[in-house]
């Protein structure tokens, strides 16, 4: 309403196969595949014009004081593309076999989740690279990986259309169910001190390294929502 009142034109570009203002998901999968196979756009960075902005906040001396944490995965598009190619050519060969193993999956999974979340690389770029690589073999593992890229967009699409799930149970039978929350238990969960070894190991791992594979992330969230909330 505020944008309309100020006569501001809002331009929003579709990304990662999620469709805004979709009435239902009946044909969503078909639309998703169409979007994933569409040509990638040329960014034409050389045509961009820089903004001249004088400030003393970004001095070279300041950046020299910054240091990277060796435990944390590096960011940026260049590193994201390198991680993608390493996964497709090498690590994906053990993808399905090791996907449920908390430790081994740290290398056999794509390690692209953080890059996708931060916008270092698009799902369409990842999809097309993995799809083309299937012709070189390893089809079963790469197909499984491609299906999980669709899952990523599916869950965001679901939240796009059912925003109330952030506050209300998906199963309406639980709407009137009231359970007290123990905030101390939740704080202990946040620190990895629940006393349950696998849950605590997963939480401490993600706090230290910034990464946890899909199934271990699901474990942490499931424990929180089913046992503590």
Model-derived segments and their meaning:
Residues 108-229:
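Active-site-proximal binding-pocket segments
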Residues 1-146, 156:
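Active-site "lid/cap" and pocket-lining segments within catalytic core domains
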């Amino acid at each position: 309403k505020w944008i309309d009142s100020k006569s501001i034109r809002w331009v929003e570009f579709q990304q990662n196969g999620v469709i805004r203002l979709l009435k239902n998901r009946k044909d969503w999968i078909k639309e998703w595949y169409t979007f994933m196979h569409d040509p990638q756009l040329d960014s034409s960075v050389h045509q961009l014009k820089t903004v001249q902005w004088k400030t003393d906040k970004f001095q070279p001396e300041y950046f020299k004081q910054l240091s990277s944490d060796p435990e944390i995965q590096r960011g940026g598009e260049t590193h994201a593309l390198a991680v993608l190619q390493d996964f497709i050519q090498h690590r994906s060969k053990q993808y399905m076999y090791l996907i449920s193993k908390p430790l081994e999956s740290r290398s056999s999974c794509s390690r692209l989740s953080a890059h996708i979340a931060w916008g270092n690389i698009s799902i369409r770029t990842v999809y097309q690279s993995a799809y083309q690589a299937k012709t070189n073999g390893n089809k079963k593992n790469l197909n499984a990986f491609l299906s999980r890229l669709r899952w990523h967009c599916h869950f965001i699409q679901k939240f796009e259309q059912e925003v109330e799930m952030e506050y209300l149970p998906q199963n309406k039978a639980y709407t009137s169910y009231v359970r007290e929350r123990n905030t101390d238990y939740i704080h202990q969960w946040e620190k990895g001190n629940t006393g349950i070894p696998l849950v605590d190991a997963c939480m401490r791992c993600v706090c230290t390294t910034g990464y946890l594979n899909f199934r271990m992330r699901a474990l942490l969230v499931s424990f929180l929502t089913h046992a503590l909330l």
